[in-house]
């Protein structure tokens, strides 16, 4: 997984692979302009949530349904309406944010850091206010998201799930039975919202 940006052509998210002994790849176009909140028709309440000091926002939906676009739009809104340090950890970086009122630090797994856990382990040492985790795939990553919220940071993340109910089931099932009681307490105190997206044909 990586991103490329040939001059004069555009920016693309790429997945390269081998099939039948040959190289194959899939490219998805990434718009270079970060869409405005109003252009996407996002619920107005999300403006309040993205301006929160702390908590967790989860975006869920199938691959290609616009989770990254919505998060980029919300970060763009925060970038223009507050004065904080935003850190994103992505695989790969999709939307490139310019510094507006905020300082935006973007780290790509495999390029700027060896792995998710290495990047997440050191994130709090970089004095963030808002942290974007490109994707929650395992318990350790979810642990970091909860820890970030508990220490006074706003954390945005994506998760592959078809609905908000399924997203919560997946999060709960990341953890062993003996930890679930504490997990539910942590989520009740820190989860600001689960936003489920589906593209309309």
Question: Could you tell me what each predicted segment is?
Answer:
Residues 1-201:
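Short, flexible helix-loop junctions that flank or precede catalytic/ligand sites
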């Amino acid at each position: 997984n990586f991103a490329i940006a040939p001059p004069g052509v555009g920016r693309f998210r790429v997945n390269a692979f081998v099939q039948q002994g040959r190289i194959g790849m899939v490219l998805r176009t990434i718009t270079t302009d970060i869409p405005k909140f109003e252009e996407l028709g996002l619920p107005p309440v999300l403006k309040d949530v993205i301006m929160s000091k702390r908590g967790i926002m989860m975006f869920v939906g199938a691959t290609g349904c616009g989770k990254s676009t919505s998060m980029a739009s919300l970060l763009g809104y925060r970038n223009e309406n507050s004065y904080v340090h935003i850190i994103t950890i992505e695989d790969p970086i999709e939307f490139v944010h310019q510094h507006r009122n905020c300082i935006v630090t973007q780290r790509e797994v495999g390029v700027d850091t060896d792995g998710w856990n290495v990047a997440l382990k050191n994130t709090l040492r970089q004095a963030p206010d808002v942290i974007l985790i490109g994707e929650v795939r395992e318990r350790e990553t979810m642990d970091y998201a909860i820890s970030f919220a508990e220490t006074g940071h706003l954390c945005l993340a994506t998760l592959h799930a078809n609905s908000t109910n399924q997203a919560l089931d997946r999060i709960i099932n990341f953890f062993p039975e003996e930890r679930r009681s504490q997990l539910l307490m942590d989520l009740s105190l820190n989860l600001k919202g689960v936003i489920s997206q589906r593209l309309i044909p």
